[in-house]
């Protein structure tokens, strides 16, 4: 058996954020270092010393992992969402919970995207199980995945239309705000409709400080029904890798309202960190993973936070600079890949298999095991 690691995400679709953040991005970074890791390939089962199952715990994957473990491979299971949360007591998610617990019990190493999620996972396991916390990296480039040309053309055309409207607004003194993210989940509250909670504040502030709101998401229907009727200019842009980061950078402030429940409280800091890294001030609701950015954004008080930023561009600039420093120190792709590499080295060492040499000694690894 060689020292190779196979990484199996739930989806290889680059439009799925968890696929990029929990597999494709770190994998590409590690491959650029010459580290022996690849996207899982069934034809290469005999070469894998370890396999990462990223949010994958269906029956077929479980039995595959069971057989690979019997043959000596190490199993790593990574989770980035609280799939134990089932507020509607749906049968599907009750069964999924059992499958998830089964996969975690089988795994030799467990990874969670946040400390809150690690604590949730811990409650489902034996008290002595260790869980490694490896957060999401901040992406600096997304438009390097293959996409149909016609989709790219359509996305660029749509973005040009929105950008033209933003320029007109800015010439009229409007400050552009943005919300971006998945429109929502079928099994937990949250997503685009969280904006409804701050609608009264936004409409009131718009009378004093003219603003616009752009929604970058994956449900125009939900936007048309719930956001477009607001009493201020709003725009919709379908998420696409060719336009997303350009669109985010065209705004001044990101708004991230979050309904508190066991699902959202386990989410990572990725949206907040990405917005700060791209130069936007951020007003958001507090969740545990946002705590380290508390001095680089406005958390919790929507009216006061928005008014502070709209009245004081210099404060926005100062907070963005502080936020970027935190991201560069802790949440860049190379830094997060370091944590994955350290985990893989440890797992391979238990099999008495040497990993590829580190291209360079990286200081200041932020690695923690709960």
Ranges and model annotations:
Residues 51-52, 105-115, 132:
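A short beta-strand/loop micro-motif in the catalytic core of glycosyltransferases
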Residues 93-110:
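Membrane-proximal helix-turn-helix segments that form the acceptor-binding/catalytic region
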Residues 116, 137:
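Carbohydrate-associated surface elements
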Residues 51, 68-84:
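Active-site proximal beta-strand in glycosyltransferases
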Residues 85, 187-193, 241-242, 246-247, ...:
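Nucleotide-sugar-dependent
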Residues 311-349, 363:
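A charged, aromatic-enriched C-terminal amphipathic alpha-helix characteristic of glycosyltransferases
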Residues 6-29, 139-250:
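Conserved catalytic-core segment of nucleotide-activated headgroup transferases in glycan assembly
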């Amino acid at each position: 058996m060689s020292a190779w690691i196979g990484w199996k995400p739930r989806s290889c679709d680059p439009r799925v954020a968890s696929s990029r953040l929990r597999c494709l991005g770190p994998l590409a970074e590690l491959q650029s270092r010459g580290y022996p890791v690849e996207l899982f390939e069934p034809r290469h089962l005999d070469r894998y010393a370890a396999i990462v199952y990223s949010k994958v715990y269906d029956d077929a994957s479980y039995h595959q992992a069971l057989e690979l473990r019997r043959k000596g491979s190490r199993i790593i299971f990574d989770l980035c969402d609280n799939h134990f949360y089932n507020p509607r007591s749906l049968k599907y998610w009750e069964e999924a919970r059992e499958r998830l617990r089964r996969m975690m019990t089988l795994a030799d190493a467990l990874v969670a995207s946040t400390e809150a999620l690690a604590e949730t996972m811990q409650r489902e396991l034996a008290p002595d199980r260790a869980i490694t916390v490896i957060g999401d990296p901040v992406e600096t480039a997304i438009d390097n995945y293959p996409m149909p040309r016609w989709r790219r053309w359509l996305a660029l055309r749509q973005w040009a239309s929105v950008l033209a409207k933003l320029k007109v607004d800015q010439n009229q003194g409007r400050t552009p705000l943005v919300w971006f993210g998945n429109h929502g989940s079928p099994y937990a509250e949250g997503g685009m409709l969280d904006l409804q909670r701050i609608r009264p504040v936004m409409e009131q502030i718009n009378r004093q400080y003219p603003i616009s709101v752009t929604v970058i998401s994956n449900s125009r229907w939900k936007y048309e029904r719930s956001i477009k009727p607001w009493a201020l200019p709003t725009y919709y842009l379908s998420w696409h890798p060719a336009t997303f980061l350009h669109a985010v950078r065209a705004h001044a402030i990101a708004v991230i309202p979050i309904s508190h429940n066991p699902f959202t409280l386990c989410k990572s800091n990725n949206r907040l960190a990405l917005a700060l890294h791209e130069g936007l001030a951020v007003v958001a609701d507090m969740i545990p993973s946002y705590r380290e950015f508390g001095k680089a954004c406005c958390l919790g008080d929507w009216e006061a936070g928005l008014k502070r930023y709209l009245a004081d561009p210099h404060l926005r600039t100062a907070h963005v600079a502080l936020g970027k420093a935190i991201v560069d120190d802790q949440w860049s792709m190379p830094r997060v890949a370091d944590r994955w590499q350290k985990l893989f080295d440890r797992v391979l060492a238990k099999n008495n298999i040497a990993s590829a040499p580190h291209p360079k000694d990286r200081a200041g690894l932020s690695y923690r095991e709960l």
